[in-house]
Design a protein with these regions (language model features):
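Extended, helix-rich structural scaffolds rather than catalytic motifs
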Residues: 131-257
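Carboxylate-rich helix-loop segments that flank metal/cofactor sites and access channels
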Residues: 33-70, 74, 134-139, 154-158, ...
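Helix-loop segments that flank and shape redox-cofactor active sites
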Residues: 1-13, 81-98
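Short, glycine/acidic-rich hinge or "gate" loops at secondary-structure transitions
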Residues: 2, 7, 31-40, 122-131
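Domain-scale activation on soluble regions of proteins
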Residues: 1, 56-66, 73, 87-88, ...
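Glycine- and acidic-residue-rich phosphate-binding/metal-coordinating active-site segment common to enzymes
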Residues: 92-156
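Amphipathic, well-ordered alpha-helical segments in soluble domains
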Residues: 21, 78-85, 111
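Conserved alpha-helical segments that form or flank metal/cofactor-binding pockets of metalloenzymes
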Residues: 15-45, 115-120
Length: 257
């Protein structure tokens, strides 16, 4: 069952639009890349999320979505990855790809709204129940028909982790090649105040050395994946901060991190 007809309509709209995004990419492959493009397009259409024999390439898109909380987290966090990947491709010098991605970005904005507002409603209802019944006990809150805040945090942790992997290796020669050849840009490339060639520039990234996380620097061209991930992290944090206003306003100490 769905929380409301409004949510059911949003679910249908998100699914229809994501299907349209798939077909848009298949069209580009068929229209501009000859026989190889047609074969890749057919392979895209053949893949199924979670299928044992022909799954999606990226792990995050094979994870199950068994409940509405998972759906809202997916649209808030994982569709936000889509925003940044599409924005980078919208900077492409290949005009058909650029125009297609710009159109898709308008639909991704709605998907993220569905996720953020859906989770916000859940948090609000939980905080209302906590205040009304003066309890933070998870079992009692679940008995009242709401989702306790620590469980929401666990869902947030999971979806954040699997989505973070979508950006690939922090240091990538492929990312450098795509950028140097004009296939892909950075998020809001035209707003960045540099030479847009990145020769001699560096970018910080974190890695594990021994038992510590240390900050290193790499050529900016090879660290483009990490830069895009950092942009995404900042945006996710902004949404989480908006969620945190709800328990803060209710006088509840819990904060999402």
């Amino acid at each position: 069952t769905c929380p409301s007809l409004y949510d059911l309509r949003n679910l249908f709209q998100v699914n229809v639009e994501e299907g349209r995004h798939l077909w848009a990419m298949v069209y580009l492959l068929h229209a501009h890349f000859g026989r190889d493009g047609r074969e890749e397009g057919e392979a895209l259409l053949a893949r199924r999320s979670g299928d044992a024999d022909n799954p999606r390439i990226l792990t995050a898109f094979n994870e199950k979505t068994p409940d509405w909380l998972s759906f809202f987290m997916f649209t808030f966090i994982t569709d936000r990855d889509g925003k940044y990947q599409l924005a980078a491709l919208a900077e492409s010098g290949f005009d058909p790809l650029s125009r297609t991605c710009r159109f898709m970005l308008t639909e991704e904005a709605h998907h993220m709204f569905v996720g953020e507002s859906g989770i916000a409603r859940i948090i609000q209802r939980t905080c209302d129940a906590m205040k009304e019944h003066k309890t933070e006990d998870a079992a009692r809150l679940r008995g009242l028909g709401v989702i306790d805040l620590p469980t929401l945090q666990k869902y947030l942790n999971f979806h954040y982790s699997v989505t973070s992997d979508l950006y690939g290796s922090e240091i990538s020669s492929n990312a450098a090649s795509f950028y140097a050849n004009g296939l892909k840009g950075r998020f809001e490339e035209t707003k960045l105040a540099d030479d847009h060639r990145l020769h001699g520039s560096e970018y910080p990234y974190m890695e594990v050395t021994g038992d510590q996380i240390v900050v290193n620097h790499a050529p900016a061209l090879t660290a483009l994946n990490e830069r895009l991930r950092d942009d995404w992290v900042t945006d996710v944090q902004a949404g989480v901060s908006r969620w945190n206003r709800i328990p803060e306003k209710a006088g509840i100490a819990f904060r999402f991190t």
